[in-house]
């Protein structure tokens, strides 16, 4: 069977599934392997009963895609895929690059955040926040102001010789229809990837940075009804913006809340000590 090599989130990935959106890599010893196979027997009943996810702490995890395809991630180094009878390949590859690789990194004890990563020319900045907070809107505006593109939606952070680094993911940005139209990109030049969520993909080789960057700032975006803001809106017709620097326990709580699968791990297994150490290093290095 054909084997493909890619550089994804800074890791050499060997895969039996092609990823047209990823950066090709020379063949060599892989840090992550993606291949076809059967699910472990212990998970057969879960799939038959209609369950969608299962985790075994930070050791292994399983999830089922809406087309019936199943994915098993173990040891921070292997992803096994069992295709359904009618696989939706664009959805499968998208989830392998997000959820699949997120589980790999968390199992490796590395922080993996929800958010976008951009490059200022000197350092990486992360844009985090809940769905609807404006991450994509702010990221698109900054990209139009000539910042570099590192990652869209999910970001791997890990220790480097000079400090904590944000790794590039792959040169593709996901857009909803409204955002694509707002930035003036013709829809026919984009790739339609998700009918249910009306999502498009934009290949961003034009501004993609292939090397990791030292993490500088993390911005948590949110929409709040804060006392005094309503008056500003009524008086000026514009929304007021407030910024606050977080330190200490609040900074750590904020970082942990932005981890991929944060709620699952906070309320079941808890965040393991090695991963918490990485969060402490990030809080000490980056302004939040």
Residue ranges and their predicted role:
Residues 2-18, 22-23, 120-130, 144-288:
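Glycine-rich, often acidic-flanked micro-motifs
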Residues 62-69, 73-123, 184:
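Extreme N-terminal, non-catalytic leader segments
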Residues 1-88, 280-288:
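Long, basic/Gly/Ser/Thr-rich N-terminal segments
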Residues 54-55, 97-101, 199:
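Short Pro/Gly-enriched beta-strand edge/turn motifs at strand-loop
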Residues 37, 106, 148:
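Short, solvent-exposed cationic patches
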Residues 138-139:
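Post-Walker A alpha-helix
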Residues 135:
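Conserved lysine of the Walker
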Residues 56, 93-94, 248:
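Generic structural signal for well-ordered secondary structure
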């Amino acid at each position: 069977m054909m084997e493909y090599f890619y550089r994804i989130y800074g890791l050499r990935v060997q895969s039996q599934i092609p990823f047209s959106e990823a950066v090709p890599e020379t063949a060599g010893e892989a840090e992550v392997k993606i291949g076809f196979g059967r699910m472990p027997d212990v998970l057969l009943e879960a799939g038959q009963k209609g369950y969608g996810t299962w985790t075994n702490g930070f050791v292994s995890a399983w999830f089922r895609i809406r087309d019936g395809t199943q994915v098993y991630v173990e040891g921070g180094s292997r992803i096994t895929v069992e295709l359904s009878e009618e696989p939706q390949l664009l959805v499968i590859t998208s989830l392998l690059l997000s959820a699949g690789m997120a589980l790999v990194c968390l199992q490796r004890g590395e922080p993996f955040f929800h958010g976008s990563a951009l490059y200022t020319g000197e350092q990486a900045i992360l844009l985090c926040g809940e769905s609807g907070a404006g991450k994509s809107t702010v990221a698109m505006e900054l990209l139009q102001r000539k910042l570099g593109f590192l990652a869209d939606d999910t970001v791997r952070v890990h220790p480097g010789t000079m400090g904590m680094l944000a790794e590039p993911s792959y040169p593709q940005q996901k857009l909803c229809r409204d955002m694509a139209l707002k930035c003036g990109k013709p829809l026919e030049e984009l790739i339609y990837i998700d009918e249910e969520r009306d999502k498009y993909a934009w290949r961003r080789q034009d501004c993609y940075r292939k090397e990791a960057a030292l993490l500088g700032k993390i911005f948590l975006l949110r929409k709040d009804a804060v006392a005094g803001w309503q008056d500003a809106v009524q008086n000026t017709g514009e929304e007021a913006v407030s910024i606050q620097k977080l330190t200490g326990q609040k900074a750590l709580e904020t970082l942990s809340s932005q981890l991929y699968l944060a709620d699952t791990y906070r309320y079941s297994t808890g965040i393991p000590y090695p991963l918490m150490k990485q969060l402490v290093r990030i809080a000490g290095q980056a302004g939040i």
